[in-house]
């Protein structure tokens, strides 16, 4: 009688006895016996998972120097890998192979994993996986897409059941199709029948039910495979006509696959046809969509309209600017009322116009309301929409050109600012101030006084030159600290000294003024130092005995030079405090740390 073959657990124990904890072989004969017994033993996937024999054999293969033993171990591991792979191939296809070639070309949608290719464990796992998939994808919109696809194929009529294939041809098909998927999902294409298909066909209805189950099982991949790119024009439309054309092409492909011949080489042409079909589908969607979804942009041409609509709150884009009422509606909500706009001075109109960043001249809605002819405003609006970089510059400085003369006539459109001699005020874009254009013209009587307020201090002395001299009015203290003034004065003094001029210039007066100012400032500020005290005459402990009064004085009273010191501002510091002084009176701080004595 022959002894019963050892169990996988016994084989594992024998292998562990023949190697050390670092997987180095201690007993070569025992390891070779273990590998030969494993080569003959019909091991199952569950036994491999329980005993972890795959990891042990792989570690031995890496550590051994016997090439024959390493080759046998590698061959054994590959046979075990084929045993494990078909079970996990569906999960790997759904997780990691979604971006593989063929999965995004529309051909992945009619693939079904091959049931029964790996024996009973795989079929049980497959049924459990199919039952779990609808729950996983229940909250996604992909089921809606599979229903639509099922409905389209039901309307078109699904191709009938394919003819049965002999067992030998099916056996030759399974090893070719299962390890090498042709379109991104493991398993064979649907047109090649599996044992379940060839065993009993229920007609077109049963085939349709199987196809719906296939859609549920494939989960996300069919919808992702036929979903167009986000930049495609027909993104928001239901994919009805595209799927109809896809179903027609797939029906033709199924007919092609039914012809006899070697089954495996048809995989790559099928994938290329699927990719061609997806490209045809995108162009078909473009031809079939004269109107587009609300959120998508069919072509670059309407894009400027949408951008302009965000800037100009009017129902018409900027390409049709010859309607002044639309422009008038734009400025009225921001303005208080048209009458008060007319009462304000021109300078404020220009300031408000420059504040509008939309590039529309603010004086356009005012001129027709004031009784002037609206034709000039129309012409100006047409000129404003001329486009290009020149139009941007014109828009930026456009409010200068819209000024009303004292006579009540409108200035012509397109006139350069240099030719407008009648203006009282002008806006300086560099200083962002409103300044008078010429000093000779008299001030208008109807203009309010507060238009003079935005001027700087340097402009006010020019207006009051008749009352005070600029020398008395100017704040020389502020000017002396200006770096530009100081650099200018130093350059002037160097020029004067090099030319040998004897006349004192502005730099002489400025330097004299600065010297005088500095002397008065130093005289006003006193230095902050410690109070000096004379040499001590009484030395307790040296010249006489230490008394109780000395102890009380050093503990409870301030004794300069003994338990602390005093500064000129009346602050007392003991020897544990930091002292901060200003010995020169020039804001320079001298910080004395504790336990430091200065002579």
Swiss-Prot record:
A single Gene Ontology CC term: core mediator complex
Pro residues: compositionally biased ranges: 314-324
Superkingdom assignment: Eukaryota
Family to which the UniProt record says this protein belongs: Belongs to the Mediator complex subunit 26 family.
InterPro entries: MED26, Med26_C, Med26_Mid, TFIIS/CRSP70_N_sub, TFIIS/LEDGF_dom_sf, TFIIS_N
Highest classification ranks of the organism: Eukaryota, Metazoa, Chordata, Craniata, Vertebrata
Subcellular localization(s) per the UniProt record: Nucleus
Single GO MF descriptor: transcription coregulator activity
Residues of the TFIIS N-terminal domain: 10-87
Keywords, alphabetical: Activator, Nucleus, Phosphoprotein, Transcription, Transcription regulation
The protein's assembly and partners: Component of the Mediator complex, which is composed of MED1, MED4, MED6, MED7, MED8, MED9, MED10, MED11, MED12, MED13, MED13L, MED14, MED15, MED16, MED17, MED18, MED19, MED20, MED21, MED22, MED23, MED24, MED25, MED26, MED27, MED29, MED30, MED31, CCNC, CDK8 and CDC2L6/CDK11. The MED12, MED13, CCNC and CDK8 subunits form a distinct module termed the CDK8 module. Mediator containing the CDK8 module is less active than Mediator lacking this module in supporting transcriptional activation.
Biased composition (Basic and acidic residues): 123-133, 207-218, 441-463
Disulfide bonding pattern of the chain: none
Pfam families per UniProt: Med26 (PF08711), Med26_C (PF15693), Med26_M (PF15694)
Any one Gene Ontology BP term: positive regulation of gene expression
Protein's UniProt keywords contain Phosphoprotein: yes
Compositional bias (Polar residues): 174-191
Main location: nucleus
Segments of this protein annotated with the region Disordered: 98-331, 352-403, 427-470
Positions of post-translational Phosphoserine modification: 447, 469
PROSITE patterns in the record: TFIIS_N (PS51319)
Annotated function: Component of the Mediator complex, a coactivator involved in the regulated transcription of nearly all RNA polymerase II-dependent genes. Mediator functions as a bridge to convey information from gene-specific regulatory proteins to the basal RNA polymerase II transcription machinery. Mediator is recruited to promoters by direct interactions with regulatory proteins and serves as a scaffold for the assembly of a functional pre-initiation complex with RNA polymerase II and the general transcription factors.
Protein name per the record: Mediator of RNA polymerase II transcription subunit 26
């Amino acid at each position: 009688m022959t002894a019963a073959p050892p169990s996988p657990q016994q084989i594992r124990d024998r292998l562990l006895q023949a190697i050390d904890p670092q997987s180095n072989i201690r007993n070569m004969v025992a390891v070779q016996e273990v590998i030969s017994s494993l080569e003959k033993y019909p091991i199952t996937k569950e036994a491999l998972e329980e005993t972890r024999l795959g990891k042990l054999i792989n570690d031995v293969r890496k550590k051994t120097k016997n090439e024959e033993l390493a080759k046998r171990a590698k061959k054994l591991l590959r046979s075990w890998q084929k045993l494990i792979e078909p079970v996990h191939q569906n999960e790997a296809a759904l997780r990691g192979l979604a971006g593989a070639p063929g999965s995004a070309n529309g051909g992945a949608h009619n693939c079904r994993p091959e049931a029964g290719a790996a024996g009973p464990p795989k079929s049980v796992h497959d049924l459990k996986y199919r039952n779990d998939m609808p729950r996983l994808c229940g909250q996604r919109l992909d089921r809606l897409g599979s229903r639509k696809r099922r409905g389209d194929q039901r309307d078109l009529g699904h191709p009938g059941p394919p003819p049965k294939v002999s067992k030998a041809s099916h056996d030759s098909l399974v090893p070719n199709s299962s390890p090498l998927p042709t379109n991104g999902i493991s398993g064979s294409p649907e047109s090649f029948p599996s044992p379940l298909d060839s065993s009993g066909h229920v007609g077109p209805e049963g085939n349709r039910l199987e196809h719906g189950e296939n859609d549920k099982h494939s989960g996300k991949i069919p919808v992702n495979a036929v979903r167009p790119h986000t930049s495609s024009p027909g993104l928001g439309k239901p994919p009805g006509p595209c799927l109809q054309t896809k179903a027609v092409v797939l029906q033709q492909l199924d007919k092609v696959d039914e012809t006899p011949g070697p089954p495996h080489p048809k995989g790559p042409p099928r994938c290329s046809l699927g990719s061609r079909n997806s490209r045809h589908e995108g162009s078909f969607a473009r031809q079939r969509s004269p109107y587009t979804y609300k959120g998508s942009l069919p072509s670059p041409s309407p894009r400027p309209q949408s951008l302009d609509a965000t800037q100009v709150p009017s129902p018409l884009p900027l390409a049709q600017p010859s309607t002044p009422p639309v422009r008038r509606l734009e400025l009225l909500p921001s303005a208080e009322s048209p009458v008060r706009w007319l009462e304000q001075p021109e300078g404020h109109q220009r300031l408000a116009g420059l504040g509008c960043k939309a590039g529309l001249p603010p004086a356009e809605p005012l001129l027709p309301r004031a009784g002037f002819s609206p034709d000039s405003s129309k012409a100006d609006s047409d000129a404003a929409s001329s486009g290009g970089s020149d139009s941007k510059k014109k828009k930026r400085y456009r409010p200068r050109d819209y000024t009303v003369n004292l006579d009540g006539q409108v200035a012509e459109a397109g006139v350069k600012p240099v030719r407008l001699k009648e203006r009282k005020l002008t806006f300086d874009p560099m200083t962002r101030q409103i300044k008078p254009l010429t000093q000779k013209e008299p001030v208008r009587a109807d203009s309010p006084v507060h238009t003079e307020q935005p001027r700087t201090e340097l402009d006010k002395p020019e207006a009051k030159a008749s009352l005070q001299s600029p020398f008395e009015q100017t704040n020389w203290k502020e000017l002396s600290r200006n770096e530009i003034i100081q650099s200018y004065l130093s350059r002037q003094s160097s020029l004067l000294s090099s030319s040998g001029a004897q006349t004192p210039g502005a730099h002489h007066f400025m330097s004299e003024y600065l010297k005088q100012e500095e002397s008065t400032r130093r005289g006003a500020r006193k230095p902050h130092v410690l109070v000096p005290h004379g040499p001590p005459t009484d030395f307790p402990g040296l010249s006489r005995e230490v008394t109780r009064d000395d102890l009380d004085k050093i503990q409870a009273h301030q004794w300069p030079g003994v338990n602390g010191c005093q500064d000129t501002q009346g602050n007392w510091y003991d020897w544990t405090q930091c002292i901060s002084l200003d010995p020169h009176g020039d804001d320079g701080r001298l910080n004395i740390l504790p336990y430091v004595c200065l002579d």
